[in-house]
C-alpha cells in the first residue's frame, strides 16, 4: 500500500477502451493515426496493467503516443526525460538535506533529544523530495497517471537495473523510508531510439512494439489531421517525396515529425505543389545532416520528384 496520503480517489475516472477498435477510435479522436498492431498492443498494456516498451527511429511518434493517451483519458502526464548520467536523485527521490539539518539543530537546541524519534522525523515524507517516478506512484483523483520514460537508451545499465522494481511491482524501496507501492498502477510508456540495446531483463517486464515509419496512406492521413491547411495536391506530393527519400542511403531518414515540419514550412511559403528548387531550398527542414542535404540537392531532388510524379500517374 502506498505510504503517501493522496486526494480522494473515488472521483470519476475516464474509462479505458474496452476493445481494440475503441483504442483506435480513442487515439484517432485525439489526433493520432495509429495502425491496428499498435492499437492492439496498447489495448493489451492497458488491460493487463503492463508497461509498454516502444522502440523505433527518432521522429516516428513514440513520445506522442503517451501524450495523446494522457490527453484522451484525461490523465496527468508525468514525463521523465532520460539523459546520460541520470540517477536516482534526479529520477526518483532525494532528501531535503538542508531541512533535515535545520530540524536536527532545532531539536538539539531544545535539549532532551529522542534520537529514534528524531531519526523518524527527519526521514519522513515531510523532507522527501519526490521526482517523476515517485510522483507516478502517488494516488491521483483523476486516475492513475500516464508515466512516460522517454529515450531510455540515453541512460546506462545501472539506471535500467533500478527501474526493474518499478516496472514489475510498481513500487520503489527507499532505505530510510520504506517501500512505496502504487495503490493503482500508473500507465507506463517507455521509449527508446535504439541507439543501444536495452537489457532483456527490462524488456521482459514490458509489452514490446516496434514503431516503424508509416506507409504512404497512413502518413497522408497523419498529415491531413495535423496540417489540414496544406493543399491536397501538396500533401500528396510531400508524402510521396518523403516515402521516396527514406529509400535513399541517408545517415538519418526523416521521421513523421519532419514530414509535418516540412508541410508547415511549405504552407508558410504559399506552396501549392513541389518543384525542384523549392525542395532544394527547404531540405534543411526535412533532413538534419549536411551530408544528407548535399546528397539530395539539385539534380537528385529533381530526379526523385520526377520519379514520384511518374509513379502517381500510373
Protein language model regions, located:
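C-terminal regulatory/interaction module of P-loop NTP-utilizing enzymes
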Residues: 1-314
Amino acid at each position: 500500500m502506498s505510504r503517501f496520503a493522496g486526494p480522494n480517489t473515488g472521483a470519476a475516472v475516464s474509462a479505458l477502451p474496452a476493445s481494440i477498435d475503441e483504442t483506435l477510435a480513442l487515439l484517432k479522436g485525439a489526433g493520432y493515426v495509429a495502425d491496428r498492431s499498435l492499437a492492439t498492443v496498447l489495448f493489451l498494456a492497458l488491460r493487463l496493467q503492463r508497461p509498454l516498451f516502444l522502440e523505433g527511429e527518432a521522429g516516428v511518434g513514440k513520445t506522442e503516443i503517451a501524450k495523446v493517451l494522457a490527453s484522451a483519458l484525461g490523465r496527468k502526464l508525468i514525463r521523465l526525460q532520460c539523459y546520460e548520467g541520470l540517477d536516482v536523485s534526479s529520477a526518483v527521490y532525494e532528501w531535503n538535506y538542508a531541512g533535515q539539518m535545520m530540524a536536527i539543530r532545532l531539536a538539539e537546541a531544545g535539549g532532551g533529544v529522542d534520537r529514534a524519534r528524531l531519526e523518524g522525523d527527519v526521514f519522513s515524507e515531510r523532507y522527501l523530495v519526490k521526482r517523476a517516478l515517485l510522483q507516478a506512484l502517488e494516488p491521483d483523483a483523476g486516475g492513475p497517471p500516464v508515466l512516460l520514460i522517454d529515450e531510455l537508451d540515453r541512460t546506462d545499465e545501472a539506471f535500467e537495473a533500478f527501474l526493474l522494481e518499478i516496472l514489475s511491482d510498481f513500487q520503489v524501496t527507499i532505505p530510510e523510508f520504506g517501500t512505496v507501492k502504487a495503490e493503482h498502477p500508473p500507465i507506463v510508456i517507455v521509449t527508446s531510439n535504439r541507439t543501444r540495446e536495452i537489457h532483456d531483463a527490462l524488456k521482459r517486464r514490458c509489452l514490446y512494439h516496434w514503431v516503424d515509419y508509416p506507409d504512404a496512406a497512413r502518413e497522408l492521413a497523419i498529415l491531413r489531421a495535423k496540417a489540414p491547411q496544406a493543399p491536397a495536391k501538396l500533401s500528396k506530393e510531400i508524402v510521396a517525396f518523403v516515402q521516396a527519400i527514406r529509400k535513399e542511403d541517408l545517415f538519418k531518414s526523416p521521421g513523421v515529425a519532419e514530414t509535418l515540419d516540412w508541410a508547415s514550412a511549405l504552407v508558410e511559403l504559399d506552396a501549392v505543389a513541389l518543384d525542384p528548387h523549392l525542395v532544394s531550398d527547404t531540405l534543411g527542414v526535412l533532413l538534419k545532416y549536411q551530408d544528407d542535404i548535399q546528397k539530395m540537392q539539385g539534380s537528385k531532388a529533381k530526379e526523385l520528384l520526377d520519379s514520384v510524379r511518374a509513379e502517381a500517374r500510373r
